[in-house]
């Protein structure tokens, strides 16, 4: 095998030596391509696995943790929630519409593969500077393309997109982030797993035909960008949501039978990863007859068939003798269904082309025992340069308030979420635009499932460990503010180039933060994804661990809003304000800096707040609640009253006026009627949570907070209309 071919497959000299040892000979091109894909960062997690192994993954309510297509938790009365968040960053930067659309398609398949009907989607989007003349036009093109791709796929599938977050920063100029989350629901006893066992059991290919789109996608997503990346468009998959809708319905029909042993979606690395993962998990072997693969392009080679990432395809291990029944279901839905292989006990993947053996590869070294790297790490030099920076006011409070509320990181994103169908399936209780976590009703048990997606890249830049822990806490707090109990998380870890020791240190610290927070807050990790090499021309993104917290409220009718719908409601701030300005939005807007330091998270205070919110809501003491986040109580209150029908007369009580922009954790704003104040304050005292009365909601159409005063019309214009103008 010549060195240029090996290099083109991103195989290092050390890895090639391992390949020779595993095979006992030189690989052919097909085998090299298969091994390259399975050992890519995207499929093998070779740089990250050693840090992920310490995550807490168990709890009495966890049915399935990491290692399957998606995580599963018990949501009561025999029902389960199946969910996962995943990235499609590199493809979305190259081809925003197709990249984002197929990102949604992939995460939907991960969930319905487990036997669940998908009932909700979320997304976390990060773009570059939309004001800089050099890149704003391209960034706006990316925003519009990505949003269009997400809405197109989700809407066509009939899956409501009910929430998300969108942020902008210069660090994403060369690498945008597109993280998609999906949640499905099924009976706890009806979960299907990705396994291929039982010698002689048939392996069936179902779904759309295979083309050349997406070739090398897993390898492409395991490398950084440079000027040559513009030629990578052919590696972006092309999605067809209508085919996926048929595939989902066919699979859900199949799941009502007892015809199959296991099922796996064909995602990154296509037929390669699905076959190796199914056999690897089961400790079995497999024969694949590649010439039987349904194709839509002529002249496709075994190499292309194994590595194509054409969308809307699944691999099924059926029970012997039930092949025709399985095929009949998929034919009914006008989908291809062909037996292309069988399970063996050899522990090897045997690839045939017109009855000729063209590839023979041991499965375990590519799946369960793929190489794990221990890359060098070192603390970034910039941390010592930024840690002592202190924020001081230079602008007036009113001026800062206005600048912040109309900033693209805070203002309303109706331009984005209005393109998503949030009410299809008629389960949505709380959707995008209503602040905080989103929530859906589970008709089978009357419960509400709340979910929130969170990632503050600036905080992770300032302190990767505490920043990651804060993401776990913040996502959980948003869920708690709906009245639900946070139960588990899914994570999508977006970082720069792992070959840079400073980036690897950031990643290791981020994992420590997640591990610590999940353990202390009792919200285990049940699924996730790692996206590395988010780097262009040597510049990495800020560390960006995206966390989705999922929780359950037993009675969906008790789901809390984040808006004040009545006048004369008492407005309270819960939790302590500690003067946290490191990595804050107010610093970024006033000083154009991301600097400072972060305080350690007080987990006892966080848990106490969650417990108080749950109990107060159970006792029907609260009218509304919202987590305090970016921009401090000033922005939290401004947004709550912007989406409300009433005005506000509020006084913070802070001696230092800048404290209204403090971003301390473990805080929430709640609204309650005056007759419930005494009972609520007694409960807060019982849980050890400080409660500060800020004022009341009023019938007058104005917003007043300390020296800040705006008419309701001015407030609404700043919040609701700014982004539409910025994105045009």
From Swiss-Prot:
Biological-process GO terms, alphabetical: 'de novo' IMP biosynthetic process
Enzyme Commission code: 6.3.5.3
Gene Ontology MF term list: ATP binding; magnesium ion binding; phosphoribosylformylglycinamidine synthase activity
Reaction(s) catalysed by this chain's protein: N(2)-formyl-N(1)-(5-phospho-beta-D-ribosyl)glycinamide + L-glutamine + ATP + H2O = 2-formamido-N(1)-(5-O-phospho-beta-D-ribosyl)acetamidine + L-glutamate + ADP + phosphate + H(+)
Chain sites annotated for binding substrate: 87-90, 109, 237, 309-311, 531
Pathway: Purine metabolism; IMP biosynthesis via de novo pathway; 5-amino-1-(5-phospho-D-ribosyl)imidazole from N(2)-formyl-N(1)-(5-phospho-D-ribosyl)glycinamide: step 1/2
Residues binding Mg(2+) 1, per UniProt: 86, 529
Pfam families (UniProt xref): AIRS, AIRS_C, FGAR-AT_linker
Keyword terms of this UniProt record: ATP-binding, Cytoplasm, Ligase, Magnesium, Metal-binding, Nucleotide-binding, Purine biosynthesis
Cellular compartment(s): Cytoplasm
Residues that, per the record, bind ATP: 45, 84, 491, 528
Positions of Mg(2+) 2 binding: 110, 265
Active site: 42, 88 (proton acceptor)
GO CC, one annotated term: cytoplasm
Primary location: cytoplasm
Record-linked HAMAP family: PurL_2
Family: Belongs to the FGAMS family.
Subunit structure: Monomer. Part of the FGAM synthase complex composed of 1 PurL, 1 PurQ and 2 PurS subunits.
Function in brief: Part of the phosphoribosylformylglycinamidine synthase complex involved in the purines biosynthetic pathway. Catalyzes the ATP-dependent conversion of formylglycinamide ribonucleotide (FGAR) and glutamine to yield formylglycinamidine ribonucleotide (FGAM) and glutamate. The FGAM synthase complex is composed of three subunits. PurQ produces an ammonia molecule by converting glutamine to glutamate. PurL transfers the ammonia molecule to FGAR to form FGAM in an ATP-dependent manner.
Name of this chain's protein: Phosphoribosylformylglycinamidine synthase subunit PurL
Organism: Campylobacter jejuni (strain RM1221)
């Amino acid at each position: 095998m010549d060195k240029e071919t090996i290099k083109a497959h991103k195989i290092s000299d050390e890895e090639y030596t391992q390949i020779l040892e595993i095979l006992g000979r030189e690989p052919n091109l097909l085998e090299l391509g298969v091994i390259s894909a399975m050992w890519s960062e995207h499929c093998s997690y070779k740089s990250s696995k050693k840090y992920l192994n310490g995550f807490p993954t168990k709890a009495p309510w966890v049915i399935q943790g990491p290692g399957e297509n998606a995580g599963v938790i018990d949501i009561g009365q025999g029902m389960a929630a199946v969910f996962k968040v995943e990235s499609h960053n590199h493809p979305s930067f190259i081809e925003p519409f197709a990249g984002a659309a197929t990102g949604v398609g992939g995460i939907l398949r991960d969930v319905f593969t487990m036997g669940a009907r998908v009932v909700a989607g979320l997304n976390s989007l990060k773009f570059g500077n939309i004001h800089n003349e050099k890149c704003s036009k391209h960034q706006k093109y990316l925003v519009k393309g990505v949003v269009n791709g997400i809405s197109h796929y989700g809407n066509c599938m009939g899956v409501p997109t009910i929430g998300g977050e969108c942020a902008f920063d210069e660090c994403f100029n060369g690498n945008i982030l597109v993280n998609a989350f999906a949640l499905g629901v099924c009976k706890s006893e009806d979960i299907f797993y990705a396994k291929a066992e039982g010698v002689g059991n048939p392996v069936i290919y179902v779904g759309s035909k295979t083309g050349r789109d997406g070739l090398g996608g897993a390898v492409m997503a395991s490398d950084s960008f440079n000027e040559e990346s513009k030629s990578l468009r052919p590696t972006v998959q092309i999605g067809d949501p209508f085919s996926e809708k048929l595939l989902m319905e066919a699979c859900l029909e199949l799941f009502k039978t007892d015809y199959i042993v296991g099922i796996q979606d064909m995602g990154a690395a296509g037929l390669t990863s699905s076959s190796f993962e199914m056999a690897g998990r089961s400790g079995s072997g497999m024969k694949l007859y590649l010439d039987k693969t349904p194709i839509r392009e002529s002249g496709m080679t075994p190499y292309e068939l194994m590595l194509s990432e054409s969308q809307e395809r699944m691999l099924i291990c059926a029970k012997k003798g039930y092949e025709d029944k399985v095929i009949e279901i998929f034919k009914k839905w006008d989908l291809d269904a062909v037996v292309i292989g069988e399970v063996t006990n050899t522990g090897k993947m045997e690839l045939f082309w017109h009855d000729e053996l063209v590839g023979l590869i041991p499965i375990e070294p590519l799946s369960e025992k793929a190489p794990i790297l221990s890359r060098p790490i070192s603390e970034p030099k910039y941390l010592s340069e930024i840690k002592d920076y202190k924020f001081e006011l230079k602008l007036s409070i009113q001026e800062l308030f206005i600048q912040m509320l109309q900033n693209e990181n805070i203002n309303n994103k109706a331009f984005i979420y209005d393109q998503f169908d949030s009410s299809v399936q008629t389960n949505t209780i709380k959707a995008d635009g209503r602040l905080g976590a989103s929530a859906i009703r589970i008709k089978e048990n009357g419960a509400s499932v709340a979910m929130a997606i969170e990632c503050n890249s600036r905080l992770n830049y300032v302190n990767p460990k505490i920043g990651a822990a804060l993401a776990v806490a913040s996502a959980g707090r948003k869920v708690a503010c709906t009245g639900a109990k946070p139960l588990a998380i899914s994570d999508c870890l977006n970082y720069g180039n792992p070959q840079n020791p400073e980036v690897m240190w950031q990643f290791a610290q981020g994992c420590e933060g997640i591990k610590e927070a999940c353990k202390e807050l009792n919200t285990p990790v049940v699924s996730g994804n790692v996206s590395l090499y988010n780097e262009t021309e040597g510049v990495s993104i800020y560390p960006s661990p995206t966390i989705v917290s999922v929780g359950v409220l037993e009675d969906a009718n008790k789901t809390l809003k984040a808006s004040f719908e009545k006048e004369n409601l008492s407005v309270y701030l819960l939790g302590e304000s500690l003067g946290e300005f490191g990595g804050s939005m107010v610093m970024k807007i006033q000083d154009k800096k991301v600097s400072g330091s972060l305080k350690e998270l007080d987990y006892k205070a966080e848990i106490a707040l969650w417990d108080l919110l749950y109990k107060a809501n159970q006792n029907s003491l609260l009218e509304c609640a919202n987590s305090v986040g970016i921009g401090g109580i000033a922005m939290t209150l401004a947004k709550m009253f912007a989406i409300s029908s009433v005005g506000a007369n509020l006084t913070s009580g802070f001696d230092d006026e800048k404290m209204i922009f403090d971003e301390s954790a473990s805080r929430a704003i709640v609204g309650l009627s005056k007759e419930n104040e005494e009972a609520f304050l007694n409960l807060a005292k019982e849980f050890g949570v400080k409660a500060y009365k800020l004022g009341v909601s009023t019938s007058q159409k104005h917003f007043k907070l300390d020296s800040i005063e705006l008419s309701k019309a001015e407030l609404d214009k700043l919040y609701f209309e700014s982004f539409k103008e910025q994105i045009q």
